[in-house]
Regions:
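Extracellular/periplasmic carbohydrate-active domains that bind, remodel
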Residues: 1-439
């Protein structure tokens, strides 16, 4: 169906815009090249199916990019995708149909003809994605790099790796989306060096979304299966909302609200490549069956950035009205900078965390390694010596009305702090009893 799809786009372009309509049925193809002022509409019952490459045909080759050393292959190329656009404006993809990346892959993505993303957009503006579904999307369901004025509304994603990667984008609205991504992050904001220059991801709202780590395909078909216990990084399922890891640029003015996490990792805010992460507000979050730290804030020094880039900053963060049930206690919540680079001005309030518990007083004597240059995940620290929050290399942290519950007794202290100043605890309870912060 590739030739017919190309003709449809050419006709729309010749008329200075219009709608390319996919009626009910399957349309197997390789790369679809978007154009400005085009509305791609996928009707109910229509499926755009990514074909498997053959010896003579395949997806568009990855374009040259001299700035690949600071991020992986997937973040550095856009054309090797099922649907892609570069330097475009006024684009809409909508409709109740399905984009099925059947022939896409995360593996062997450097080979000629191989496609590794469902939708890729670079340096575009005024883009709307709404109402369709994405299944089995290779490395990314959506990679949007340097896209300004991006709206993603009521999109369902069920894939094996990342769902939405929002990289170096400005003015982004993500709402009423369902993203299942057991082997990678569901909704992730990034600020890579893929464009060849520093650019922040800023002015982003994520609201009324559901993210999870159920088995691939089992959310779209509503079977909610749990038979794939481990992601490729050996960290169990993923499926979370995250800022980072790519963070050469920064993250500014981000609001996340009214979201549900289920059978996945917890909320992660990470800047480890020199970016500034600041002015973040997160509220009304509920989590269930969380496999690592419910709240993970990390300022590190991996430094996948041009030489001379200084360590980043993390400050002015508000997290409130969070409920977490059945969280793995090995990795309690973590707020950790590094020596000489402190996380600052964080307030956590109106939080309930229900942990599994079961660890010992001896576990409370452990000292986690610094791991300044390591890829940030909670398990890089080993078992956490605190059963509530581990707080290190910070300044001006407030915990107010934070309530902890434990299914099994846990002998570790509730809070462990190191190189921490101006820490305030207010209205803290453990299993319904007031916690004396003087102890």
């Amino acid at each position: 169906d590739c030739a017919a799809i190309i003709r449809a786009f050419e006709d729309a372009v010749s008329q200075c815009g219009g709608t390319v309509f996919f009626p009910a049925g399957d349309f197997a193809c390789y790369s679809i090249r978007l154009a400005s002022h085009i509305h791609l509409y996928i009707e109910q019952g229509a499926r755009i199916v990514g074909a498997f490459p053959s010896a003579t045909e395949g997806y568009d080759p990855a374009e040259p990019n001299e700035h690949t050393r600071f991020q992986d292959f997937g973040h550095s190329h856009w054309k090797n995708s099922l649907i892609w656009g570069i330097g475009l404006e006024d684009i809409t993809i909508s409709g109740p149909g399905l984009i099925y990346g059947k022939g896409l892959t995360r593996e062997e993505s450097r080979l000629p003809g191989v496609g590794n993303k469902a939708i890729s957009l670079k340096l575009c503006k005024n883009v709307t994605l709404k109402d369709f579904s994405l299944l089995q999307c290779g490395h990314f369901g959506l990679l949007a790099t340097g896209v300004d004025n991006l709206s993603i509304l009521n999109v369902k994603v069920d894939t094996n790796r990342d769902g939405f990667d929002i990289d170096c984008c400005k003015n982004v609205r993500i709402s009423h989306c369902t993203v299942n991504a057991p082997w990678d992050d569901a909704i992730v904001l990034k600020a890579s060096y893929g464009l060849g220059y520093f650019k922040d991801t800023e002015n982003v709202t994520i609201s009324d979304c559901f993210v999870s780590g159920y088995d691939r395909g089992s959310v779209l078909d509503c079977t909610w299966q749990r038979d794939e216990p481990q992601a490729p990084d050996h960290g169990f399922v993923t499926g979370r909302i995250k800022l980072g890891t790519e963070s050469s640029g920064g993250f500014k003015n981000i609001a996340i609200t009214n979201c549900i996490f289920e059978r996945c990792r917890g909320l992660a805010l990470e800047t480890v490549d020199g970016g500034k992460l600041e002015d973040i507000v997160i509220s009304n979050i509920t989590m269930r069956d969380i496999v690592n730290a419910p709240i993970f804030l990390r300022l590190g020094a991996r430094m996948r950035s041009p030489q001379g880039t200084p360590v980043g900053t993390m400050k002015r963060i508000l997290i409130s009205h969070v409920n977490v049930f059945n969280a793995d206690s090995r990795y309690s919540s973590i707020i950790s900078g590094i020596p000489g680079a402190l996380i600052e001005d964080v307030t956590l309030s109106d939080i309930h965390i229900y942990h599994q518990g079961g660890y010992t007083e001896a576990d409370g004597l452990l000292t986690p390694p610094e791991q300044e240059k390591v890829y940030p995940e909670p398990w890089m620290f080993g078992t956490i010596p605190a059963k509530g929050f581990y707080i290190r290399h910070v300044r001006n942290i407030t915990l107010d009305n934070v309530n902890f519950h434990y299914e099994k007794a846990d002998g570790r202290p509730l809070f462990v702090t190191d190189d921490a100043s101006d820490i305030r605890y207010r209205n803290i309870t453990v299993d319904g009893k007031e916690f004396n912060t003087a102890n």
